[in-house]
A protein has these predicted regions:
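Short Gly/Ser/Thr- and Asp/Glu-enriched loop/turn motifs at secondary-structure junctions
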Residues: 98-102, 138-141, 279-283, 334-338
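A residue-level signal for conserved active-site and pocket-lining positions in enzyme catalytic cores
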Residues: 6, 48, 58, 101, ...
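Long, highly charged, low-complexity intrinsically disordered interaction regions
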Residues: 115-177, 340
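DNA-contacting surface of Y-family translesion DNA polymerases
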Residues: 188, 193-335
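Acidic, metal-coordinating catalytic segment for phosphate/diphosphate chemistry
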Residues: 308-417
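Residues that scaffold, gate, or flank divalent-cation-dependent active/transport sites
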Residues: 1-100, 104
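Compact, charge-rich alpha-helical regulatory domains located at protein termini
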Residues: 18, 64, 149-231
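Catalytic palm subdomain of template-directed nucleic-acid polymerases
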Residues: 105-122, 196
Length: 417
């Protein structure tokens, strides 16, 4: 059996762990530049607030004290995610982390009282981390995702829904909107709706040739999994093959010297994430672009890839490569709205050397381990390369909560009276 452990309203739940006074209050979390809403509590959803809605449309609710708002705090969310995944792994070690708030798991088919196992795991995760989760078990990944949605929607499941026979599967398919099926989405869902397919059950009634002609192999995989036949299995290697850090800016930037510290910051984040997975990369790509939605303005977008001779996770090398790429593609007289850095061609574990390498890699590794230790104790911004400067000036985060779990200067103080 496959399973899904899905955190409920994850970003909001992370904020509520440290603000229990907001447990039953409407709460939203904003995107990087406080531009739009990327997470909502159930109470906020009930107010009609939609995902992706521009913040300015609901700002009056904040002013009227009817809505609580937080800027995205990804350092906090990433750390809370690791805590949740650690608890899940302690009970179900065969797992594939799918996203920051969701993981697939596998359990033996002969596990007794599977729903009880899921309910107990749900309680344990919330007790140990403060994060509520919904769990679904079924023969395939697609059905497990469906089961987790039912567990989230209906309180009677007590946090876990199990689809383990054809009767349950057929009932679930008949109740599940086609656009909500994993692998279908809104675009294909609308296309299917025009052909009379409203639910997952309607889609399963199509014959295989029809599905293949309309949607190709991905459609066949979804169609087959909805029948309870697994096609997607766990990918146990959780190391990423590429790592990207990017951001849109609140105000466009036209000056190269102002872009440099921002790109350096993205490159440093890539280096930190590489070291977390014990990886090293040779390819560093930097990209910049203007705002495509302002068609009246001059448009320009470009990227540059810099290849290093030896794979590295040294932030100094990665920042240097990213800045060389930036200087190659930067053009004056354009208003740049977004930039980012991607590292790829990642190797994990032992890094092959080069006869002509001019860097003392042993000495370098000692330095990087010292930096890792400092960052772990004092936060990811405790030590920086000078060029990073104050790159955060390009981000607008007016409502950011403290880094409760990753920065010693921001942990909660408890006073005993």
């Amino acid at each position: 059996m496959m399973g899904v452990v899905d955190c409920n309203n994850f970003y909001v739940s992370c904020e509520r762990v440290f603000r229990p006074d907001l447990r039953r209050e409407p709460v939203v979390v904003l995107s990087n530049n406080d531009g739009c809403i990327i997470a909502r509590s159930n109470e906020a959803k009930a107010m009609g607030i939609t995902m992706g809605q521009p913040f300015f449309q609901v700002r009056h609710l904040v002013d009227q004290h009817k809505l609580h708002v937080f800027s995205a705090n990804f350092a906090l969310y990433g750390d809370m995610s690791r805590r949740v995944m650690s608890v899940v792994r302690s009970e179900l070690p065969e797992m594939e982390i799918y996203s920051i708030d969701e993981t697939f798991v596998r359990v033996d088919d002969d596990v007794p009282r599977l729903q009880e196992v899921g309910i107990n795991l749900s309680k344990k995760v919330e007790r140990w981390t403060g994060i509520p989760v919904s769990i679904g078990f079924a023969p395939s990944k697609t059905l497990a995702k469906m089961a987790s949605k039912f567990a989230k929607k209906y309180a009677g499941y007590k946090g876990c829904c199990v689809i383990d026979n054809d009767e349950k599967r057929e009932k679930a398919l008949s109740l599940f909107p086609i656009q909500d099926v994993w692998g279908i989405g809104r675009r294909y869902g609308n296309r299917l709706a025009c052909r009379g397919v409203k639910t997952a059950a309607d889609f399963v009634r199509w014959d295989e040739k029809h599905v293949r002609s309309e949607f190709g192999l991905p459609g066949i995989v979804t169609w087959t999994e909805l029948k309870g036949i697994p096609c997607e299995y766990l990918e146990m290697d959780v190391n990423r093959k590429t790592i990207t850090n990017s951001r849109s800016f609140k105000n466009a930037i036209s000056d190269l010297e102002e872009l440099k510290p921002i790109v350096a910051d993205f490159a440093a984040l890539c280096a930190q994430q590489l070291r977390k997975q014990h990886g090293a990369a040779t390819d560093i790509c930097v990209f910049i672009r203007t705002n495509p939605h302002q068609e009246e303005q001059p448009q320009y977008a470009n990227s540059a890839n810099v290849r290093l001779d030896v794979p590295t996770s040294d932030l100094r090398e990665i920042i240097g490569a990213a800045l060389r790429g930036l200087e190659c593609i930067f053009r004056p007289n354009y208003a740049y709205k977004k930039a980012g850095v991607t590292v790829s061609n990642i190797v994990n574990g032992c890094v092959p050397g080069s006869l002509f390498d001019s860097i003392d890699r042993d000495k370098q590794e000692k330095l990087l381990k010292s930096l890792d230790s400092i960052h772990q104790k004092m936060g990811k911004d405790a030590v920086k390369v000078a060029i990073q400067g104050e790159s955060k000036r390009a981000a607008n985060r007016q409502y950011t909560s403290p880094a409760y779990t990753t920065n010693l200067n921001e942990i909660i103080e408890v006073k005993i009276l």
